[in-house]
């Protein structure tokens, strides 16, 4: 499942946490799966002054209901020591200071980063059960397209492409 993109089915419309969510599964361990909600931008952002005249401002997204006091990064650039590869040209990590250093040094463009507060998590068999119960739809998309789902209205656009069953949503 690592690297898969999930879209919440209309069966989850009453679940306010995952309502109209698009999630990228970023990690799978023996304990479970970790995902980040791609299309839930908040009204918050992180800023940092770098150098004497440059201020970096990165939008903050709601990654999910777990560990909301931690930040996670999704980026299209690799820095082998501080990130975990998800798939082709897509990495995740959690070192904000290193990220700002990379931006300051011109090694990463802030447009190539999504910053999340919290993450979504499932026990090892839990997500498979939820998919089997039609709570989630696994998209057959390339993960390098993950940045295309950043807008809040992405769910509406995608659900209409999934066939007659979902067109009314």
What are these regions (language model features)?
Residues 1-116, 120-169:
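A short aromatic-anchored loop/beta-hairpin motif
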């Amino acid at each position: 499942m690592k690297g898969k993109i999930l879209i919440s089915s209309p069966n989850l419309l009453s679940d306010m946490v995952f309502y109209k969510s698009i999630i990228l599964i970023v990690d799978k361990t023996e304990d479970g799966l970790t995902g980040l909600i791609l299309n839930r931008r908040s009204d918050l952002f992180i800023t940092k002054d770098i150098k004497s005249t440059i201020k970096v401002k990165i939008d903050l997204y709601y990654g999910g209901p777990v560990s909301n006091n931690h930040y996670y990064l999704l980026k299209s650039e690799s820095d082998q020591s501080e990130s975990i590869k998800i798939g082709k040209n897509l990495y995740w990590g959690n070192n904000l200071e290193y990220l700002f250093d990379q931006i300051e040094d011109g090694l990463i463009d802030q447009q190539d980063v999504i910053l999340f507060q919290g993450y979504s998590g499932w026990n090892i068999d839990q997500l498979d059960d939820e998919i089997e119960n039609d709570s989630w739809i696994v998209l057959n998309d390339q993960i390098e397209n993950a940045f295309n789902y950043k807008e809040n209205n992405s769910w509406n656009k995608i659900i209409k492409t999934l066939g007659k069953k979902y067109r009314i949503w």
